[in-house]
Amino acid sequence: MRVLPAAMLVGAATAAVPPFQQVLGGNGAKHGADHAAEVPADHSADGFSKPLHAFQEELKSLSDEARKLWDEVASFFPESMDQNPLFSLPKKHNRRPDSHWDHIVRGSDVQSVWVTGENGEKEREVDGKLEAYDLRVKKTDPGSLGIDPGVKQYTGYLDDNENDKHLFYWFFESRNDPENDPVVLWLNGGPGCSSLTGLFMELGPSSINKKIQPVYNDYAWNSNASVIFLDQPVNVGYSYSNSAVSDTVAAGKDVYALLTLFFKQFPEYAKQDFHIAGESYAGHYIPVFASEILSHKKRNINLQSVLIGNGLTDGYTQYEYYRPMACGDGGYPAVLDESSCQSMDNALPRCQSMIESCYSSESAWVCVPASIYCNNALLAPYQRTGQNVYDVRGKCEDSSNLCYSAMGYVSDYLNKPEVIEAVGAEVNGYDSCNFDINRNFLFHGDWMKPYHRLVPGLLEQIPVLIYAGDADFICNWLGNKAWTEALEWPGQAEYASAELEDLVIVDNEHTGKKIGQVKSHGNFTFMRLYGGGHMVPMDQPESSLEFFNRWLGGEWF
């Protein structure tokens, strides 16, 4: 049996599944012949086998029970590590000269600014270790690409010069009132999927049609907010590096640096309310990234709330709801037969026991087996049916593009030389999802770690919205509702007992139309969105923009 990625588009689970299961990725997986054209010598097949040998040596020091568990996990591995590398290969790239960019913000310059504090003593204007970071900014001509003409746009890179990491971003100013509208950072998941898929498939100002042309989106989230789309971690989308990020905490440092330098360059946006939104594996990212921002008392980031859509945040609670969602208890017909449903029920106690051990130790030695066992036992039965894991209502129509042909259109568009040139990208090819990164995070134990424990700390300071399209399987609404009710925080009892109420459109010609359900107490809100799959803004664009605008307006907090 081979380890193959059971990818969650914008939230991928690396699960052990039967060898006939198609590797999801298509155009997103190493697009173009130049993807790995420049590979360091130590990234040979022999180089990749070394981690496995070291890994096997470490196993000798474990208890008999732990070794038995790892022997079971090892049966899921390919014989040769060059078939399943634990490190992402560097992308071929060509760095543009400084003269190409309109602005370069040096982290060392920002770090050198001292001010007089309230106690009369000198202190840095902003906190954080920024010396190694630079931000490169290019004002992009909307007319050259036909994407939201008339709307101000910036693209560029955050450079971590110490670790040779370069994160690509694309900023769109609000169509409405940019001097007063909030700013939102959007993050897709994976781990290892580009946020530009969210831009062009979900909530950005344009989608890409079959002719590989941009099409105006009336329901774009920059209708009433300025939005930053960030390709992170490195080696995702247009981002690149010769090093790697393998856990969510490390990625959080980069995001803090990006925002700090961006708002330093553009103080007109820094004064606006700021929010972080994302989906799927962003259920891991966002609690960490928001906590990182809030940990800095001296900051220029006006964080007001976070929004997580169809996220994976608390595996212990959420994995319990794969069987109900697959077996007809989530509001849609059953996908699995009774025998498969029973096998999932039988596997759940062991799965939760393993996750519980992961939560206690937070050790990769415990968390990795939990991820692989639980994904194999509770995700693979659904995958084998050929049904779309992101939408229980239909089959996976395009397995080479994570079930959606539109992802292939996006990849084709972003690989056009004229697009790469217009946005200043420095890689020779764009890939929508990098499954090497997915494995990096998995084998560092990140997948099952208890990042939900950070949410109570967020609730003390800012509002948190958990929303879920109710047709998604992979990060389904049942599990998301359940973990929010199980979360221990001062308002738990009142929140858990709150009833779901109708969510209706209030501000357009469809006023009164029911689009979902909502419950809220204090700073915590959950929404179920009717008819939405894993990507709510793609499936239900009107409903998506409705709740988004109202959330930013403070209706539920």
From Swiss-Prot:
Pfam families registered for this protein in UniProt: Carbpep_Y_N, Peptidase_S10
InterPro entries given in the database record: AB_hydrolase_fold, Peptidase_S10, Propeptide_carboxypepY, Ser_caboxypep_ser_AS
Assigned EC number: 3.4.16.5
Single GO BP term: proteolysis
Keyword Coiled coil: no
N-terminal signal peptide: 1-17
Catalyses which reaction(s): Release of a C-terminal amino acid with broad specificity
Location, primary (coarse class): other
UniProt entry keywords in alphabetical sequence: Carboxypeptidase, Disulfide bond, Glycoprotein, Hydrolase, Protease, Signal, Vacuole, Zymogen
Propeptide intervals in chain numbering: 18-138
Compartment annotation: Vacuole
Family annotation (SUPFAM superfamilies): alpha/beta-Hydrolases (SSF53474)
Keyword Glycoprotein: yes
Entry GO MF terms: serine-type carboxypeptidase activity
Function noted in UniProt: Vacuolar carboxypeptidase involved in degradation of small peptides. Digests preferentially peptides containing an aliphatic or hydrophobic residue in P1' position, as well as methionine, leucine or phenylalanine in P1 position of ester substrate.
Family: Belongs to the peptidase S10 family.
The protein's name: Carboxypeptidase Y homolog A
